[in-house]
Structures are given as C-alpha cells and as structure tokens.
Amino acid sequence: MSKVQSITRESWILSTFPEWGSWLNEEIEQEQVAPGTFAMWWLGCTGIWLKSEGGTNVCVDFWCGTGKQSHGNPLMKTGHQMQRMAGVKKLQPNLRTTPFVLDPFAIRQIDAVLATHDHNDHIDVNVAAAVMQNCADDVPFIGPQTCVDLWVGWGVPKERCIVVKPGDVVKVKDIEIHALDAFDRTALITLPADQKAAGVLPEGMDVRAVNYLFKTPGGNLYHSGDSHYSNYYAKHGNEHQIDVALGSYGENPRGITDKMTSADILRMAESLNTKVVIPFHHDIWSNFQADPQEIRVLWEMKKDRLKYGFKPFIWQVGGKFTWPLDKDNFEYHYPRGFDDCFTIEPDLPFKSFL
C-alpha cells in the first residue's frame, strides 16, 4: 500500500493534534520557579496554569473543546443564554480560533484542578478524565457547586471535589486560594431550556460562579473568570493585595454584553489596585474578536491624567508570564530561538552568501 493510500482522516488528526503536542507540558514540568516569583502560562480562553516557587501546580478553567464546526443547524439552541439575552434565533458563529497548546493526557504533575463556573468553555470533561487516569489519586477538583455537580456527574468521586463559595479559603501546598464574589451576569441566565428567566429572581451567583485570588509566596494572582465589570472590584482591591489581574475581554456583538470592553478592563485594574492587568478570553471566539492593543492605547491616553498605578500586558496563548520579572513589559513574544548562532562554523559556499 502506498503512503497516500495508507493515510486516513483519523491518522491525519492523530499526527497533528494537539497542535503543540507535549511541548508546553514539558516546558511547565522543567520550569524551576525562582524564590520571590510565580510563573503562569496562558492555555487559551481563560485557562491558566500557575506554578509557585515551591513547585505547586494548579490549573484554572483549562478547556479542551471547540466551537461551531458545521452550518448544519442554522438555529441557536433553544434557551441558550445568548438567546435569552438578546432575543436571537440564528446560530451564533462562534468558531474556536486558538490552537490546543497543552495536552491534558500528558499532564503528570498537578496539585489541583479549578473552574470558575460551569460554562462549557471553562470546565472540561477531557481534563477531568486525564487527571483521574494519569495523575495522583488525591488531586482535588475545586469550584462552585454547579462545577462540582458536573464533575461528579462525569464520574469524579465526590470526595475528590471541594465546593467553594465567596469567603472560602483552600490551601494547596504553598498556594492559598481565596474564592471571591463573581460578577458573571450571563451565568445567571444559563438555565435549562424549559425554564424561563423573565420575571423570576435568579439563583444566587455564589453557587454558579466565583472569582479566585491565588496567594503565592512570590506574589498574588487575581482570576476573574467570565465576570463583567462591577463596582465590587474596588472592595476586592481594598481587602487584598493583588499583583496581577486577569480580565475577560472581547468585542461584544450588537445586542450582547458578555465581555468587558477596553474601558472596563482599565476600570477593573484601577479598582483592584493591581500592578499588572492582562486581558484574556478575546483569543478564543471568532465572533468576539478584539484587539488588545486598544487597551494599551486607551491606557496611554489616561495613565498620566488618572495617575494609573498599573500597566497592561498583552499576552499570547501558550506564552509564559513571570511575576515580578515581566511586570514592566508591555507585550509577549514567543521565544525566537537562534540564540546560539555561530557557535559552530556555518556551512556556506562563501562568507558573503548571506
């Protein structure tokens, strides 16, 4: 059988997916976090891998799914939160635009799995399966009640799950995880298809979503999940020291308010008294495409007049950010390589070839 005859769609997928293979898994495992710092990697959407100076590994909102893949059904699912929000009928054209940079089934060293809320792009059955199958049998799954309900429904033992609500603190080795109030109004209208939201007092946010503050020996990270802007960010900023804050950013389609705008991101950062603000979530959905440079431009316009005490940082999926080493950087660039150029003699026809 010739080579072209032996290749199938399945063999093509297995040979190319996930696109980064285990490259990032290996990078994270090999990273030695220096004292007085913490390192984190962007996994796409709001997925974050955090590693402390003590070698503690936690992942938050790591999602390995995809968006729309076919024009087959032109209508939105009945009762979808966006349908409730805007009274739409047409299919939402939300295609995943970000590659898969971390292989969940190559994860071996992990100390906790967390989710901020139960939306499909923030909690993942594949991650749960991979951790259950390949990692230590005491790795906890931490999240609000709706997330724990999902994990247990997928087969994660109830005793492995920790339900958190605002005010709760969970210690995972040298990382202290504080569950804080979330402000994700979209989560409140994510309901069963046959349940009406109109005229009904919504279920409390605390069972559906939380924000997290990760206090590490080397600094503190605030993860806002899918939260919208809220004045309550200022309360969180008053009560906690926050070094780096992550906020869900995107260009909201007409009739929709689901992501923070550039102005919201700056207000969030100012309210939290953070030193660095990093937008995320704008990478993942084609119909919420947004340019994070807008945040930096607006920051430049306002920073002197409003005496901002923070800087924005524009990240790339799969990239690493180390606090405080990267606190004065504005943008991430993937490693460019070739730092060892001319360590051996080039093999060229003549010196002026290049």
UniProtKB/Swiss-Prot annotation:
Names of required cofactors: a divalent metal cation
> Main localization of the protein?
cytoplasm
Question: Which EC numbers characterise this protein's activity in its record?
Answer: 3.1.1.-
Q: Name one GO molecular function term.
A: manganese ion binding
Q: Which InterPro entries match?
A: L-ascorbate_6P_UlaG, Metallo-B-lactamas, RibonucZ/Hydroxyglut_hydro, UlaG-like_MBL-fold, UPF0173_UPF0282_UlaG_hydrolase
Pathway annotation: Cofactor degradation; L-ascorbate degradation; D-xylulose 5-phosphate from L-ascorbate: step 1/4
Tell me where in or outside the cell this protein is found. Answer: Cytoplasm
Q: Locate the transmembrane regions by residue number.
A: none
Q: Which UniProt keywords apply?
A: Cytoplasm, Hydrolase
User: Which GO biological process entries does UniProt record here?
Assistant: L-ascorbic acid catabolic process
Q: Source organism's superkingdom?
A: Bacteria
A single Gene Ontology CC term = cytoplasm
CDD domains found in the cross-reference section: UlaG-like_MBL-fold (cd16284)
Its recorded reaction(s) are: L-ascorbate 6-phosphate + H2O = 3-dehydro-L-gulonate 6-phosphate
Q: What induces it?
A: Induced by L-ascorbate. Repressed by UlaR.
Query: In which family does this protein belong, per the annotation?
Result: Belongs to the UlaG family.
What role is this protein assigned?
Answer: Probably catalyzes the hydrolysis of L-ascorbate-6-P into 3-keto-L-gulonate-6-P. Is essential for L-ascorbate utilization under anaerobic conditions.
Q: What is this protein called?
A: Probable L-ascorbate-6-phosphate lactonase UlaG
Please name the source species.
Answer: Salmonella choleraesuis (strain SC-B67)
Primary gene name? ulaG
